[in-house]
């Protein structure tokens, strides 16, 4: 198993430069998320006709679905520069004040992982978002006084993978909220073909479809797999990626037809083989596969839940009928004939 998961939806070191070269710059180039695109286009057009700054935007959804890309596209569409930072990087209220007071009129401020903003920093954000002002306390004790600074109109775009962790006062100040969902295999295939054209990779539709089917519904994963399959095509093939080459390369990378890697299968096999299908507690499961509990719950479980391979119950994790069938295990008696959504 490779040290860094090829199918991780989180950004790996090599992804940043590669993604920048293939990121779309306009809504017309952005593939998928049709409802979100339609709504965003309406909001941008309306703000332009009113000659106002676009309302503040909250982008939520699993990692790797294009929240940062969409933020950059919004800035391009409104014709304003974008300034990027992240929640953990803004440690003190003064850090945020410095950013806000240096914004140009209409500029877009993008804060990734906005759910990780310090609460003291967050309180500075409230009047800035509502009234375009910030209050700075000067001095200490009885001599302290508040200085109010006016800010130019700006648009805040916040991105989060965990919208439930945002405080209600902050969440309620976003006038526009968009949730990005997993992509269909057809959409991913189009994304892969577009990336291949930009990167000058020889790839046919069947090869793109095979890569898309194992990309976990995530463009970041799809683009990463494309680059790894390209390596196999260059070294072990003739440089061209077709269905057979893509299928063989992905099998060499130990990524199956559902997009599961070695650790995904180890988790399912542990639940089925060691714990009779469950239920099994998270800590016990993590110990059985030599992994951290938080890593299991944050990195591996979401996709297994999406596929319906595991269930979370009050007593622990259970493998479903789909997991038994996928791994080729005989069904337990209480699973025989029962689907995940069976009434029985």
Curated annotation (Swiss-Prot):
Ribonucleoprotein found in the keyword field: no
Taxonomic source organism: Syntrophomonas wolfei subsp. wolfei (strain DSM 2245B / Goettingen)
Protein family membership: Belongs to the RuvB family.
Binding of ATP, residues: 22-23, 64, 67-69, 130-132, 173, 183, 220
Class of enzymatic activity (EC top level): hydrolase
Name of the protein described by the UniProt record: Holliday junction branch migration complex subunit RuvB
One GO CC annotation: Holliday junction resolvase complex
Binding site for Mg(2+): 68
Region (Large ATPase domain (RuvB-L)): 1-183
Region (Head domain (RuvB-H)): 257-344
Keywords carried by this UniProt record: ATP-binding, Cytoplasm, DNA damage, DNA recombination, DNA repair, DNA-binding, Hydrolase, Nucleotide-binding
Its job: The RuvA-RuvB-RuvC complex processes Holliday junction (HJ) DNA during genetic recombination and DNA repair, while the RuvA-RuvB complex plays an important role in the rescue of blocked DNA replication forks via replication fork reversal (RFR). RuvA specifically binds to HJ cruciform DNA, conferring on it an open structure. The RuvB hexamer acts as an ATP-dependent pump, pulling dsDNA into and through the RuvAB complex. RuvB forms 2 homohexamers on either side of HJ DNA bound by 1 or 2 RuvA tetramers; 4 subunits per hexamer contact DNA at a time.
Residue ranges, annotated region (Small ATPAse domain (RuvB-S)): 184-254
HAMAP family found in the cross-reference section: DNA_HJ_migration_RuvB
């Amino acid at each position: 198993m490779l040290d860094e998961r090829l199918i991780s939806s989180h950004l790996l070191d090599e992804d940043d430069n590669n993604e920048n070269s293939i990121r779309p710059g306009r809504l017309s180039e952005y593939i998928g998320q049709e409802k979100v695109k339609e709504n965003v286009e309406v909001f941008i057009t309306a703000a332009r006709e009113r000659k106002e700054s676009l309302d503040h935007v909250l982008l939520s959804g699993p990692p790797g679905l294009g929240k940062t890309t969409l933020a950059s596209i919004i800035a391009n569409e409104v014709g304003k520069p974008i300034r990027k930072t992240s929640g953990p990087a803004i440690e003190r209220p003064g850090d945020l004040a410095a950013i806000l007071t240096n914004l140009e009129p209409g500029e877009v401020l993008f804060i990734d992982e906005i759910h990780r903003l310090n609460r003291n920093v967050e309180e500075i954000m409230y009047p800035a978002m509502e009234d375009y002002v910030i209050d700075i306390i000067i001095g200490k004790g009885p001599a302290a006084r508040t200085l109010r600074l006016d800010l130019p109109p700006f648009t805040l775009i916040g991105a989060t993978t965990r919208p439930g962790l945002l405080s209600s006062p902050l969440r309620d100040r976003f006038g526009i909220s968009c949730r990005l969902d997993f992509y269909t295999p057809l959409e991913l295939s189009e994304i892969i073909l577009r990336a291949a054209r930009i990167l000058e990779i020889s790839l046919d539709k069947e090869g793109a479809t095979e890569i898309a089917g194992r990309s976990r519904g995530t463009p970041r994963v799809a683009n990463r797999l494309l680059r790894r399959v390209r390596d196999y095509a260059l070294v072990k093939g003739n440089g061209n990626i077709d269905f057979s080459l893509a299928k063989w390369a992905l099998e060499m990378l130990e990524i199956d037809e559902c997009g599961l890697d070695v650790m995904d299968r180890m988790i399912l096999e542990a639940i089925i083989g060691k714990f009779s299908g469950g239920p099994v507690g998270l800590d016990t499961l993590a110990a059985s596969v030599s992994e951290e509990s938080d890593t299991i719950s944050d990195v591996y479980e979401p996709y297994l839940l999406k596929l319906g391979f595991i269930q979370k119950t009050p007593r622990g994790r259970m493998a479903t009928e789909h997991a038994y069938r996928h791994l080729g295990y005989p069904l337990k008696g209480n699973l025989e004939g029962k689907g995940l959504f069976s009434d029985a």
